[in-house]
From Swiss-Prot:
General function of this protein: Catalyzes the NADPH-dependent reduction of L-glutamate 5-phosphate into L-glutamate 5-semialdehyde and phosphate. The product spontaneously undergoes cyclization to form 1-pyrroline-5-carboxylate.
Protein name: Gamma-glutamyl phosphate reductase
Record pathway: Amino-acid biosynthesis; L-proline biosynthesis; L-glutamate 5-semialdehyde from L-glutamate: step 2/2
Protein source organism: Acidiphilium cryptum (strain JF-5)
Lineage: Bacteria, Pseudomonadati, Pseudomonadota, Alphaproteobacteria, Acetobacterales
Keyword Oxidoreductase attributed: yes
Amino acid sequence: MDTATPSAEAILRTAAGRARAAMRSLAAMPAARRDGALRAAAAELRIHAVNILAANARDLDSFEGPPAMRDRLLLNEARIEAIAAGIDAIADLPDPLAGSLAEWTRPNGLVIRRVPQPLGVIGMIYESRPNVGADAAAICIKSGNAVILRGGSESYHSNTAIYLAMTKGLRQAGFPDGTVQIAPNIDRAFVAAMLGASGQIDLIIPRGGKSLVERVQREARVPVLAHAEGLNHTYIHAEADAEMARTVLANAKMRRTGICGATETLLIDAAIAPALLPRLIEDLAALGCGFRADDRARAIVPSLPAAGPADFDTEWLDAMLSVSVVDDLDAALDHIARHGSSHTEAIVTENADAAARFLAGTDSAVAMWNASTQFCDGGEFGFGAEIGIATGRIHARGPIGPAQLTTFRYHVVGTGQVRP
């Protein structure tokens, strides 16, 4: 009797086959049934909150990373409720598979409709945050996709507990077992198997640190929807409202320092810097923020530590802010072009023309005017949650919700036409 442990490739092939079968059912399923299953999954998360917290405690006990990463890993009752509420919100969204995207009639009478369609089988590779698996599963179900999850080893017990609770709800709703699956262990070979699963997985979405995303992009034989680091800037224009600038910047940097939507660099116009920069520094220092500043900023606030060569290319994910004084809007745009990651950029100004130039001049997935960069979030965009923030140009950009996990095809309706 052969008792050999199946290889990662064999496990992945089995999972992908089950996912493909489930996806075919999901694509044809009425929206009300998909939404009902999501609500059942959310209910089970609430019911099993104690088990999820116990699993999370096991992960936290063995975690040895920095405080910012520990905060990403941490679950509590409020965060579990937020996950469940996000799933309920996804269920309440319009059906991304409903209706036609476009329709037209050709001179020969053929009616052509462009209709939405699920992408297929999604592979989700993520680190640290246990909520990512729940969000990804919910967004995939809403959009008619099946998903295979592979979370980080540091959150293995939390991820598994969330998966078990959600799939209990899905089974109660009569969903195929292959709808949502999770890697059965923390074997890194499973990641390699996912990346090489051309023809089995239709899209890989990495969500995590720069090294993870770069590895996926480098090794994948499957299309990748990349989520780059958040080297986000808040630019205080010469015509900014000072009190608004103070409020927006404090939130953009310090609300949650460990998320990809946090501001990592302050750019401030030289015309307003002498009066406003000391107040901004004082506000942030009182909240526990540290700084790395260029020479022009240090000339105004001498106590600021000097920035090193790499500091303006660093995603801090912590209570640290790079600071630069720039000549004007053009200089700010130039700085962003050299150091940004195409994630989120914000301007604070009362000048509508300057704001319009900034919004058009930044090559970021999200550009903001008089708002905190931390609004770059699927929930805040009305998507219920997000599966990531796409910073590339294909297939979608910005927060990825259910509608962004669809493609389209064509339905052609005739009355017996033949082509001459």
